[in-house]
């Protein structure tokens, strides 16, 4: 019986373990944590015949080497034990690659990019569902990919949101349609350089049979003709802005969506705010037309799609003030997009665990649109200093989300502001388990006002 080790006892790791166990592998799950929740999961899995080692930093035992190592998305690909395993010729892959090995009999759409992945993935899944297709979303959204392999259903398509971390560990993953939404500096603490980050993303697209690119993204537009000239391109700026022949373009013209020369639907059917969401929609429409989905299904999904939690999500309106949750804005570019999508003046809640990147354009937009910035988390003092250096002084360090929401309500009344926006420009791990946890807390506090 072949042996497999799974590193990481999260949702992805558990699904991977069950897939392999069901295929007659001897499976061991390893996780450094030893929390009560994991201990409960350990008991459940061990009843299924899966060995679980908690409080365990996986090492290679020369006397008992696994045939396969599967890593969860959060495990760095370059930690010494994984480098050593690959050097020894041990098959070392990510959970998404494992799912691909079991599910490559059906067609995949793979969506990657710095920002916009989740909304684009959700839009594609909604359009494919409206067309009557069995096309679940997975990866960073919806199911863990291996959970789909467990069901043994027959899928028409799989719609996979794929992070750079997952691409690193998925060397043969080759979707039929690949989409690249945006590209800006992010995850450089892991990938070191912008070029490394680009090459990882590009490796996935190069394996896809057809590629769709966001032609309105400055970086992708700049390298487009030199590296991706035979691909499909989108633009919200009209036919003249396309990087390809209009027969391979998806674009807005006179408030209509046009795909490959065909009128699809009027853009006013689509209710999500922001030009960036129109960009996401065009890529989704391109994928749908490449999958031969008709215009009626596209129009139906456009009209009924309400958005994704934590991405410019309207929580409630109190006394004319909109409270908007954009917790997914974990870097400067995403926060800039969020702020540009709402009307001034704004009370902005920002801060958390800072990331590397250029904050210049974000701060310019703050100066133009924000009445007061409320700063929370580890980055509060750093952000305060950056705002001072830019001659912006309308900020307060409030430290916690509870303080921020309470203060935002009084400031909105005092200053006649109609928008309170949580768009942190930071990771969440200083105070929260995830950006979802942070956004859920913001929602809970707003609903208590």
Swiss-Prot record:
Q: Which domain of life is it from?
A: Bacteria
Keyword annotations of the record:
ATP-binding, Cell cycle, Cell division, Cell shape, Cell wall biogenesis/degradation, Cytoplasm, Ligase, Nucleotide-binding, Peptidoglycan synthesis
Pathway this chain belongs to: Cell wall biogenesis; peptidoglycan biosynthesis
Instruction: Kindly indicate whether the keyword Protein biosynthesis belongs to this entry.
Output: no
Pfam families, per the entry: Mur_ligase_C, Mur_ligase_M, MurD-like_N
ATP-binding recorded as keyword:
yes
GO CC term, one of those recorded: cytoplasm
The record's listing under InterPro entries reads: Mur-like_cat_sf (IPR036565), Mur_ligase_C (IPR004101), Mur_ligase_C_dom_sf (IPR036615), Mur_ligase_cen (IPR013221), MurD (IPR005762)
| Major localization listed first in the record, in broad terms | cytoplasm
> Might you give the EC number(s) for this enzyme?
6.3.2.9
Q: Where is the signal peptide?
A: none
Binding residues for ATP:
113-119
Q: Which SUPFAM superfamilies match?
A: MurCD N-terminal domain, MurD-like peptide ligases, catalytic domain, MurD-like peptide ligases, peptide-binding domain
From the Swiss-Prot or TrEMBL record, what is one GO molecular function term? UDP-N-acetylmuramoylalanine-D-glutamate ligase activity
One biological process term from GO is: regulation of cell shape
Q: What class of enzyme is it?
A: ligase
HAMAP family, per the entry? MurD (MF_00639)
Function of the molecule: Cell wall formation. Catalyzes the addition of glutamate to the nucleotide precursor UDP-N-acetylmuramoyl-L-alanine (UMA).
Question: So what family is this one in?
Answer: Belongs to the MurCDEF family.
Recorded protein name is: UDP-N-acetylmuramoylalanine--D-glutamate ligase
Which organism does this record belong to? Gloeothece citriformis (strain PCC 7424)
């Amino acid at each position: 019986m072949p042996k497999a080790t799974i590193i990481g006892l999260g949702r992805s790791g558990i699904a991977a373990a069950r897939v392999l166990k069901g295929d007659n592998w001897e499976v061991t799950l390893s996780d450094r944590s030893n929390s009560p929740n994991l201990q409960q999961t350990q008991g459940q899995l061990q009843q299924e015949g899966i060995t679980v080692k908690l409080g365990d930093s996986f090492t290679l035992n020369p006397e008992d080497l696994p045939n396969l190592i599967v890593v969860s998305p959060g495990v760095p690909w370059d930690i010494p034990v994984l480098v050593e395993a690959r050097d020894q010729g041990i098959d070392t892959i990510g959970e998404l690659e494992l799912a691909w090995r079991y599910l490559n009999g059906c067609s995949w759409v793979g969506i990657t990019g710095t920002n916009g992945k989740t909304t684009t993935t959700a839009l594609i899944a909604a359009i494919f569902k409206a067309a009557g297709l069995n096309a679940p979303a997975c990866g960073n959204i919806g199911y863990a990919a291996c959970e789909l392999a467990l069901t043994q259903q027959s899928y028409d398509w799989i719609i996979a949101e794929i992070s750079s971390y997952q691409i690193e560990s998925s060397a043969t993953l080759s979707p039929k349609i690949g989409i690249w939404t945006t590209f800006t500096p992010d995850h450089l603490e892991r990938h070191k350089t912008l070029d490394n980050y680009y090459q990882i993303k590009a490796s996935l697209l190069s394996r896809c049979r057809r590629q769709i690119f966001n032609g309105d993204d400055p970086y992708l537009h700049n390298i487009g003709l030199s590296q991706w000239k035979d691909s499909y391109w989108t633009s919200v700026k009209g036919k003249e802005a396309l990087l390809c022949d209009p027969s391979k373009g998806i674009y807005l013209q006179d408030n209509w969506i046009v795909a490959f020369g065909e009128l699809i639907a009027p853009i006013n059917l689509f209710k999500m705010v922001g030009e960036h969401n129109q960009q996401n929609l065009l890529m989704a429409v391109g994928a749908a037309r490449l999958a031969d989905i008709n215009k009626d299904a596209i129009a139906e999904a456009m009209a009924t799609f309400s958005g994704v939690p934590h991405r410019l999500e309207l929580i409630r309106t109190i006394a004319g003030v909109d409270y908007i949750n954009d917790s997914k804005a974990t870097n400067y570019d995403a926060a800039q997009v969020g702020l540009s999508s709402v009307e001034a003046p704004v009370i902005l809640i920002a801060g958390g665990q800072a990331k590397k990147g250029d904050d210049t354009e974000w701060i310019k937009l703050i100066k133009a649109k924000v009445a007061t910035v409320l700063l929370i988390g580890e980055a509060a003092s750093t952000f305060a200093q950056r705002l001072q250096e830019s001659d912006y002084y309308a900020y307060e360090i409030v430290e916690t989300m509870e303080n921020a929401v309470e203060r935002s309500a009084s400031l909105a009344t005092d200053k006649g502001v109609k928008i309170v926006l949580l768009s942190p420009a930071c990771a969440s791990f200083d105070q929260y388990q995830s950006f979802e946890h942070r956004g859920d807390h913001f929602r809970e506090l707003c609903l208590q006002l």
